[in-house]
Structures are given as C-alpha cells and as structure tokens.
C-alpha cells in the first residue's frame, strides 16, 4: 500500500488577518472580529496581539474588552472571508483535487499521488504557503504527516506561520509523547476519566489492550487505541454533503424564562422551513433538534428520533432542553438532521449493476 501524504493547512487568525490586510492601520494592535459589546456580541477570532491579553474566540465581547481595554472589535465581513477562501482553494487545486474543507480557513489535502516537486509533500506545503503569502498577503501554517490526525496536530506545532513535518519513521516516537488531550475526540470528561486511570499520554494508552479500552470507553476505546498507535485511516473526503440544516439567533436581551423562549419558536421555524425548501429533492429530513445557550454561555443540544418537525414537537424539545439549565437564555437554535438522497440513489445504482 502506498504511504499516504496528508497536508493540513490552517490560516493564521484568518478573519483578523484579512481585516489587517485590508486596513493596515489595524496591524500590530489588539484586534478582534465579532459582535459589539453593546449588542451582547461574541468574539469570532482575534489576532495574536489580542491573545496576549487572554482574549479568545467564543468569548463575550464585553469580557474581551475587560481583559484588553484597547481592543478594537470590527464586524465580520463574511463575503471578504469567503472570497479569500475561494482564492486559497484555487491554489490547492493546482496540486490535488482531494481537498476536504473543515471551514473557510482550514482544510486537509491528500497529495499522495501529486506529481509536483517529485511527489514531495513537504515542498508542496512550502509552495502553498509561499503562494498564499504572495497572492493574499496573509500567512498559513501547515502540517505534513501520513494521516489526518497527525497532520492536524502538526499544523498547530509551529503556529503562526509555521511548517511541521512528521515522517512515517517519526510517528512512533512522536505519538508516544503526546498528551491524551491532543487526541481527536478527547474532551475534558474523557481526559479526566483517562487521568483517573493513570493515563496521561499516548505511551500510557499503549500499555492498555484494545479490549480493556473498549470496556472502559465503548466503541471510542478502539479509536483511542488506534490513535495512540498513530493509526488513522480516515480518507480525505471532498464530498460536501450536509449532515443537518439549522437556524439560530442570539438575542439582544436574555430570554428570562421558558415562555419567552417559546414565543421565539414560530419565527425560527419559518426560517428553517425556507432553508429546507431550498434543499428539496436532495435530502430527506430526519430527527429534529434544538440548541439552547444560557446567559452564562453553558449550552445544551437535544434531538429526538421519531419526533415531528411541527411547532408542537419543537416546543416539547425546547421545554426539555430549557429544563436542563432553567436559566435566562441568550441563544436559541433549531434544526433537522438530514439523510442524503443522492447517497441512497448511488447505492441503488451500485446494487443494480
């Protein structure tokens, strides 16, 4: 089997970088992109000058200004960011068609069969970084590795504006020293449970059998075992089929109780219906879900198999989700999981051959 060559590209503070490029007087000063503090806005991203003060994405703009009183907050210009992302992807396509976008500013590339630079993934990554810098006047960080799990870790290793390569013969030693918190899918709860078992890094994980990990963590235990051994067979998928469709709204004033939340549902449901109508014939709607973010930024999502997608069904889901926190609400969202009709059609064609 041919050794895979995967590149993970991650733009450095992308939205903020575009703003500093287009408004040079913003460069070198603490800058964030997000909503205004007066309208209960949230930080989408910030530059490294702002991060030095502790400002982070998903933080309320009001709190960010407390940490950094000189912080400049600008409104997002999504069309500018989308255009920059399109330009970057045009560069990607000069090297491979196997591109898996994760967001506007992040993507995996499989260059295993690329002929550029005699097939050197490292030189391809260097050239992509050079071209993005020259054409868009922003920087990107890149990670090169034999799989997606390691390529993503590598791109973060020398941020910002860095390149880090993990060759196949380095995988064993590199992964052994990785803390379990670096593993894809390991959040605080799983990390705490691993810690109680005396598992701090991947070397510790390797000391446990696959069966023992499955007993402790269910099917995710098998995934943990694979990652601890540097194994990740997930392909780079350039299929943009959707998993769900949703709509959400952050309110200027907290919704104080369930009744106030329920009043907002009809408008959300109307918008959701319009979005679903645009996808008719491509997807079959599945489970409905609701998302509630409380005033203290804790949030919960609830979905239910077999439930309808009418107002009454969403009201029941919202009531259950609200009860989990029973606090004032700053954001409400509703949505539907989707089943791809094109995939089902392709399967029928396959079995009919």
Curated annotation (Swiss-Prot):
Cofactor: Mg(2+)
UmuC domain mapped to chain residues: 6-187
GO BP, one annotated term: error-prone translesion synthesis
GO cellular component: cytosol
One Pfam short name: IMS_HHH
Catalytic machinery residues: 106
Reactions accelerated catalytically: DNA(n) + a 2'-deoxyribonucleoside 5'-triphosphate = DNA(n+1) + diphosphate
InterPro entries: DNA/RNA_pol_sf (IPR043502), DNA_pol_Y-fam_lit_finger_sf (IPR036775), DNA_pol_Y-fam_little_finger (IPR017961), DNA_polymerase-Y (IPR050116), DNApol_IV (IPR022880), PolY_HhH_motif (IPR024728), Rev_trsase/Diguanyl_cyclase (IPR043128), UmuC (IPR001126)
Binding site for Mg(2+): 10, 105
Transcription regulation among keywords: no
Domain of life: Bacteria
Function description: Poorly processive, error-prone DNA polymerase involved in untargeted mutagenesis. Copies undamaged DNA at stalled replication forks, which arise in vivo from mismatched or misaligned primer ends. These misaligned primers can be extended by PolIV. Exhibits no 3'-5' exonuclease (proofreading) activity. May be involved in translesional synthesis, in conjunction with the beta clamp from PolIII.
Family: Belongs to the DNA polymerase type-Y family.
Protein name from the UniProt record: DNA polymerase IV
Lineage: Bacteria, Pseudomonadati, Pseudomonadota, Gammaproteobacteria, Pseudomonadales
Gene: dinB
């Amino acid at each position: 089997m041919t050794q895979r060559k995967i590149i993970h590209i991650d733009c450095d503070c992308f939205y903020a970088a575009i703003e500093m490029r287009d408004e040079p007087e913003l460069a070198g000063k603490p800058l964030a992109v997000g909503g205004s503090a007066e309208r209960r806005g949230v930080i989408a991203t910030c530059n490294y000058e702002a991060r030095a003060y502790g400002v982070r994405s998903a933080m309320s703009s009001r709190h960010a200004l407390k940490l950094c009183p000189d912080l400049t907050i600008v409104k997002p210009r999504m069309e500018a960011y989308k255009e920059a992302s399109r330009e970057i992807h045009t560069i990607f396509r000069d090297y491979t068609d196997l591109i898996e976008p994760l967001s506007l500013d992040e993507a995996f590339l499989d260059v295993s069969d690329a002929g550029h630079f005699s097939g050197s993934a490292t030189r391809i990554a260097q050239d992509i970084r050079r071209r993005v810098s020259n054409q868009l006047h922003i920087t990107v960080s890149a990670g090169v590795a034999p799989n997606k799990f390691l390529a993503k870790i590598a791109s973060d290793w020398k941020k910002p504006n860095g390149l880090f390569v993990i060759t196949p013969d380095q995988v064993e030693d590199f992964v052994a020293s990785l803390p379990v918190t670096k593993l894809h899918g390991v959040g605080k709860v799983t990390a705490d449970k691993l810690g109680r078992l005396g598992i701090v890094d991947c070397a510790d994980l390797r000391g446990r059998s696959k069966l023992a990990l499955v007993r402790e963590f269910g099917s995710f235990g098998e995934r943990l075992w694979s990652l601890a051994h540097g194994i990740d067979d997930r392909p780079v998928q350039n299929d943009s089929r959707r998993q769900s469709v949703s709509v959400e709204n952050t309110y200027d004033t907290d919704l104080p109780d369930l009744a106030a939340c329920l009043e907002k549902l009809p408008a959300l449901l109307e918008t959701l219906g319009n979005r679903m109508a645009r996808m008719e014939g491509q997807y079959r709607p599945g489970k409905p879900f609701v998302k509630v973010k409380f005033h203290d930024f804790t949030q919960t999502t609830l979905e239910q198999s077999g439930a309808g997608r009418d107002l009454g069904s969403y009201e029941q889901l919202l009531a259950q989700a609200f009860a989990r926190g029973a606090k004032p609400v700053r954001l409400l969202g509703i949505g539907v999981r989707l089943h791809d009709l094109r995939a089902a059609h392709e399967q029928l064609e396959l079995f009919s051959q």
